[in-house]
Amino acid sequence: SNGRNAAAGDKPSYWITLAITDCCANPVCNGKHCQGRR
């Protein structure tokens, strides 16, 4: 993964990690970062 996403923009890396985790739990966002997670 590129470590960046549209939702996170250029936020701190910890924020990006949280955003990706939240994205995993979000069915609308799921798949962008969490392919195969669900």
Swiss-Prot record:
Q: Name the Gene Ontology molecular function terms of this record.
A: acetylcholine receptor inhibitor activity; toxin activity
A single GO cellular-component term from the record reads: extracellular region
The protein's PTM annotation reads: The two analogs ([DelQ14]LvIC and [D1G,DelQ14]LvIC) are amidated at their N-terminal Cys.
List of residues that carry Glutamine amide = Q35
Q: Which domain of life is it from?
A: Eukaryota
Cysteine pairings via disulfide bonds: C23-C29, C24-C34
The answer to whether UniProt assigns keyword rRNA processing to this entry is no
**Pro-sequence positions in this chain?**
1-21
Q: Which UniProt keywords apply?
A: Acetylcholine receptor inhibiting toxin, Amidation, Disulfide bond, Neurotoxin, Postsynaptic neurotoxin, Secreted, Toxin
Q: Name one Pfam family in it.
A: Toxin_8
Q: Cellular location of this protein?
A: Secreted
UniProt note on tissues of expression: Expressed by the venom gland.
InterPro entries, A to Z: Conotoxin_a-typ (IPR009958)
Q: What does this protein do?
A: Alpha-conotoxins bind to the nicotinic acetylcholine receptors (nAChR) and inhibit them. This synthetic peptide inhibits rat alpha-6/alpha-3-beta-4 nAChR (IC(50)=3.3 uM).
The Swiss-Prot or TrEMBL note on domains reads: The cysteine framework is I (CC-C-C). Alpha4/4 pattern.
| Entry similarity comment | Belongs to the conotoxin A superfamily.
Q: What else is known?
A: Negative results: The native synthetic peptide, and its two analogs show little or not inhibition on mouse alpha-1-beta-1-delta-epsilon (CHRNA1-CHRNB1-CHRND-CHRNE), rat alpha-2-beta-2/CHRNA2-CHRNB2, rat alpha-2-beta-4/CHRNA2-CHRNB4, rat alpha-3-beta-2/CHRNA3-CHRNB2, rat alpha-3-beta-4/CHRNA3-CHRNB4, rat alpha-4-beta-2/CHRNA4-CHRNB2, rat alpha-7/CHRNA7, and rat alpha-6/alpha-3-beta-2-beta-3 (CHRNA6/CHRNA3-CHRNB2-CHRNB3) nAChRs (IC(50)>10 uM).
Protein name, entry field: Alpha-conotoxin LvIC
